[in-house]
Amino acid sequence: MSILTLSLSLMACGDSSWWSKDEPTLKSDQIKRTLPPRVNQREAWGKDIFDITQQLGIPQTKENICSIVAVVDQESNFVADPQVPGLGEKAVKEVQDRLDEKFKDKLGDAIGGTVAGYFQDVLKNQPNPKDNYLGQMRRVKTERELDELYREIFDYMSKHYHVSALTGAAKLVGQDIGEKLNPITTLGSMQVHIGYAKEHKRQGGNIAELRTDLYSQYGGLYYGIHRLMMYPADYDKAIYRFADYNSGMYSSRNAAFQSMLNDLTVAELELDGDLLLYNKDGSIRSVSSQSERELISVFARNNILVTPRQIRTDLKKEKEKKFEDTATYRAVTKLYEEKTGKKPIYAIMPEVVISGPKLSRDYNTNWFATRVNGRYQSCMQRAKRIKI
């Protein structure tokens, strides 16, 4: 298979115009044969993957199916609601060590500290002192259990504790306070961020129902497959899509853009795949990033007529395919080719650290993508034995 065909088979968009039309596809009973031998309920997983890819218009090529299989296997080993070793104790430690800090970060110093105090009181004394929420938290085994416990705690608070302060906090954040403060933000068998699922809801219902859907086998797969596959990128290797799954859409392409920019300046940009600075809620900050400042400097030194305002406008498209059509992207690739005599770089591995209470230690995107890629290669070996 050519590199071009492979890259096309790994891309998606709404009208399917990015897909290779010629490759043979797998049926439901063939998809189950691509799963690792240890997977339970193989037929059900295979059918769900087939049905979801069919619904989303994703051809069931070996490459596409194995990309999906590899990520599911990495994130959950094909368990819809997997147990997380030591999760309860980690959650308790996080609450005890960083509760006040996190609430103030989410709600501000004035209200955050007050609500944190209420929360601590509820943890220690409710629903009763002998079997309090803190003890229940220690006993949780799965992410879903912890998520549901947090929701129960916030529901209790809203009904019994200082309603006026909680209402004020809710007005401040503009949403359900329990959802705002819930630390479980990635869910299900493919660990999809709740914010992404909200933007791409497959059915009606409130946020609690969406969370429940993500913990189901079908729902977890649906949102994960959507996040992994439903955007076009000209990657010549699947590993870059796996990196994007961990560090953000187009982060591999954007890290390559930063790498080219590094070769045009004396600065040493971090190759994290973020060309702008972002707030924790995902909104763009007004302050200029180092990448943005270096672009302005490089363009000025080389008499490239792209204004700072245009640069900012272009960089706002960094999470989209059309960033590649901007004056900024084209100017950098052209200048890079002129200055170095090399072809422009389309993708490299982003340098991003992964951390969180569910992890035993910090990792980076390269670790994640490499692990997924190993599972992808194993899946492709199994797929080669399937005649289609």
State what each model feature region is.
Residues 1-2:
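Bacterial N-terminal signal peptides that target proteins for export
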